[in-house]
Amino acid sequence: MDLTPREKDKLLLFTAALVAERRKARGLKLNHPEAIALISAAILEGARDGRTVAELMNYGRTILTRDEVMDGIPEMIPDVQIEATFPDGTKLVTVHQPII
């Protein structure tokens, strides 16, 4: 299986998101990389489902709450930016203050 560097990055991101999802389901608080991975993967999947950039910017703020991450993590993540593929091309989605 030959993967491009972009495809390898997406695969790594989704693997990290799966780990984060499982830890969250067990009641563990997520750390910085886990929180970023979970939010990013949800944005990518939302784009694949046909949501708009504006919808994803709002949706990105609903994925995690302050209670689901370790202390100080919300302040460490002022925004999350991810390039997502939409039907009309690749666009940068920015989620400001993703953990409230």
Swiss-Prot record:
Pathway: Nitrogen metabolism; urea degradation; CO(2) and NH(3) from urea (urease route): step 1/1. It holds the Pfam family Urease_gamma. Its EC number is 3.5.1.5. Keywords: Cytoplasm, Hydrolase. InterPro entries: Urease_gamma, Urease_gamma/gamma-beta_su, Urease_gamma_sf, Urease_subunit. Gene3D superfamilies: Urease, gamma-like subunit (3.30.280.10). Signal peptide: none annotated. It catalyses: urea + 2 H2O + H(+) = hydrogencarbonate + 2 NH4(+). The keyword Hydrolase applies. It is an enzyme of class 3 (hydrolase). Heterotrimer of UreA (gamma), UreB (beta) and UreC (alpha) subunits. Three heterotrimers associate to form the active enzyme. Belongs to the urease gamma subunit family. This is Urease subunit gamma. It comes from Tolumonas auensis (strain DSM 9187 / NBRC 110442 / TA 4). The gene is ureA.
